């Protein structure tokens, strides 16, 4: 009796049930985000908190910064911030520059909240360092430090504007993270970035410039045409922050009295009308007290905060000038030996 012939397909290995994959990072490694109480809080923003996540394993891993929606956020605003976080993850995933915080993963934590995992850019924001310096009774940052921040942030903006055709949209000291003694300087929080067209304009009628009020240029306050120069205006005010240790257009009040009275005193002395009148303009700067060594930074601040956007320099121009100055400074400090 002839044995029956079976087709090869009859002996296929039974299919195993598909496994549910864990979220992975940019390198393909599964990611598990701890609940918020198990991570150190680094800071907070509008509707979000940022935590430090120390990664455990057989090998040494760099820590990550984890951004997630604040649990105390108003229920009606949660969807808005979730959408913004998703948008930031999408944008950040496409960016790679030494002066911009890098993307690591977009996943869900054990508590069910959406999380954006990012490169740990530093222990503190530039704003944290400004506040600390002011509380210690110190004056402006050393000019070398300001020039270094100016160059590194300008390089990040150049990459965003020219290579990625993106407006950051919320440039300020809070969105610059610092590692160590200014060893690393990176721009963060690209969640409100806007696309730029070939003319460096935000031409999408649906796009809305958000920014932060004290750093907004006149054109943003008056519903004008938004270009890359909106970032440059806010960049200039960020340098001003480092020279004055203040928030643009908000006078720092004398806080020698009881701490309990500070908030009440501020409310009584704050001139709201004057504040709104000053928005979008160049805040005063005492260049004489700063001294001659700050002249380059004072001039850059003035150029960046011109009311007319067309008179402000581009990020490319700023980088070119600052890099030239940096090279010149190095040459001037070299010892020349003549035989």
From Swiss-Prot:
InterPro entries: Kinase-like_dom_sf, PKc_TOPK, Prot_kinase_dom, Ser/Thr_kinase_AS
PROSITE patterns: PROTEIN_KINASE_DOM, PROTEIN_KINASE_ST
This protein's UniProt keywords: ATP-binding, Kinase, Nucleotide-binding, Phosphoprotein, Serine/threonine-protein kinase, Transferase
This enzyme's EC code(s): 2.7.12.2
Amino acids binding ATP: 42-50, 67
GO molecular function terms listed in the Swiss-Prot or TrEMBL record: ATP binding; MAP kinase kinase activity; protein serine kinase activity; protein serine/threonine kinase activity; protein tyrosine kinase activity
Superkingdom assignment: Eukaryota
Pfam families attached to this UniProt entry: Pkinase
GO biological process: stress-activated MAPK cascade
Reaction(s) this enzyme catalyzes, per UniProt: L-seryl-[protein] + ATP = O-phospho-L-seryl-[protein] + ADP + H(+); L-threonyl-[protein] + ATP = O-phospho-L-threonyl-[protein] + ADP + H(+); L-tyrosyl-[protein] + ATP = O-phospho-L-tyrosyl-[protein] + ADP + H(+)
Modified residues (Phosphoserine): 203
Domain Protein kinase: from-to ranges: 36-328
Activity: how regulated: Activated by phosphorylation.
The record's account of how the chain is modified after translation: Phosphorylated; in a cell-cycle dependent manner at mitosis.
Active site: 170
Family: Belongs to the protein kinase superfamily. STE Ser/Thr protein kinase family. MAP kinase kinase subfamily.
The protein's name in its UniProt record: Lymphokine-activated killer T-cell-originated protein kinase homolog
Organism of this sequence: Danio rerio (Zebrafish)
């Amino acid at each position: 009796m002839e044995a029956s012939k079976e087709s090869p397909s009859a002996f296929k290995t039974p299919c195993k049930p598909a496994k549910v994959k864990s979220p992975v990072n940019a390198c393909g490694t599964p990611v598990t985000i701890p609940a918020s109480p198990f991570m150190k809080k680094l800071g907070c923003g509008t509707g979000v908190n940022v935590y430090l996540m120390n990664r455990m394993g057989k090998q040494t891993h760099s820590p990550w910064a984890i951004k997630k929606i604040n649990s105390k956020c108003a229920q009606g605003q949660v969807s808005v911030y979730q959408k913004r976080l998703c948008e930031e993850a999408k944008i950040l995933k496409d960016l790679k520059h030494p002066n911009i915080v890098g993307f690591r993963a977009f996943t869900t934590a054990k508590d069910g909240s959406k999380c954006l995992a990012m490169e740990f850019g530093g222990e503190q924001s530039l704003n944290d360092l400004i506040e600390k310096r002011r509380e210690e009774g110190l004056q402006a940052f050393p000019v070398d430090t300001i020039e270094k921040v100016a160059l590194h942030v300008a390089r990040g903006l150049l990459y965003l504007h020219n290579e990625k055709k993106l407006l950051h949209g919320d440039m300020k000291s809070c969105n610059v993270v610092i590692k160590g003694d200014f060893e690393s300087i990176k721009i963060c929080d690209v969640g409100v970035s806007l696309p730029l067209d070939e003319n460096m304009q935000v031409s999408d009628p649906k796009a809305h410039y958000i920014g932060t009020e004290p750093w907004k240029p006149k054109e943003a306050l008056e519903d004008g045409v938004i270009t890359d120069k909106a970032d440059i205006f806010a960049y200039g005010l960020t340098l001003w922050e480092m020279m004055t240790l203040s928030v643009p257009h908000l006078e720092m009040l004398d806080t020698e009295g009881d701490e309990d009275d500070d908030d009440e005193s501020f409310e009584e002395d704050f001139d709201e009308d004057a504040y709104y009148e000053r928005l979008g303009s160049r805040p005063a700067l005492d260049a004489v007290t700063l001294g001659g060594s700050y002249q380059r930074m004072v001039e850059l601040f003035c150029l960046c905060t011109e009311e007319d956007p067309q008179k402000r320099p581009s990020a490319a121009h700023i980088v070119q000038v600052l890099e030239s100055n940096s090279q010149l400074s190095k040459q001037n400090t070299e010892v020349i030996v003549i035989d």
